[in-house]
């Protein structure tokens, strides 16, 4: 009789009291200032009444049990709910990386969010979901555009790469070389630390570059054998240039849809150093290069070697990490020997009203902001170059 009464109450009643597991996805995005979590996506079996949800219906906790503010709620439909999370340059609890000064590198923060329902909800059929009816479990972390890349390793170098869908045509290859803070063995920080990888898989860049392949290698240590930060010397393992060139050549060979006449290479800071070194080592491989705030002043011999490769340099005059003279002098000499070279100099780095460290002039590059005297933006200029 008790069982019968219970079933009758369940059928006729207005409250769902059983416990059910609901999975949710945490979504992130790479911004100029780094990667952050931006939203949570919930998928319910039942249709939720949108009017019963507000920003206080759920409590979101990070893996460190820090509160994340829910700013707004969106509905994909009545079953799929988006909790938009507060994020921004100064919202540290949203970060997906932290800076390890001892390693002098960015380190991935393991993401394990907790979601707690703090108020009752109502379904479209007017039944009530009590706040302890559902138990919520994080299913996955999805990062916009980063998830378009796959992982690989060759010649002791890990890498992430993006391959466009095959269409029977040849397409360019863009190689992005990260800075000093994105080395290591994670095989992810080189496309998480800044927009250096993801910028080229975004829709606009894909159109400009004719749906390119994108390759982002990661050095196990630093591209440089050694360098100083103040009085502190940081030491890399070796010169990775031969391994890097072997990786690039093998990657091209293994992907015959890549157009060998449209191989573009670029990087920022120490990645700018490595771009110069790679151009010198394999001057006949690349159709163009884009180098931002390079942590290196090439010798005249090296500049003579790369003079036949079109190069666009970008730097900020207020950069206190890498002297602007590296770009100024490189441009001046390359121009004097008749090279196809462009130089864009900014005073500081201000994007959408937000002021950043002036070493971040690569923000401009990755937003396709630099323009030459003919009114051509950097991406369009690079995309116009062919080796033969």
Residue ranges and their predicted role:
Residues 175-177, 292:
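Alpha/beta-hydrolase
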Residues 252-305:
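Primarily recognizes the serine-hydrolase "nucleophile elbow" in alpha/beta-hydrolase
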Residues 312-314, 318-321, 325-328, 332-388:
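C-terminal catalytic histidine-bearing segment of alpha/beta-hydrolase fold enzymes
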Residues 177-179, 315-316:
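The conserved beta1-alpha1 loop
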Residues 173, 180-242:
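Active-site machinery of serine-nucleophile hydrolases
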Residues 9-19:
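Hydrophobic h-region of N-terminal signal peptides that target proteins for export
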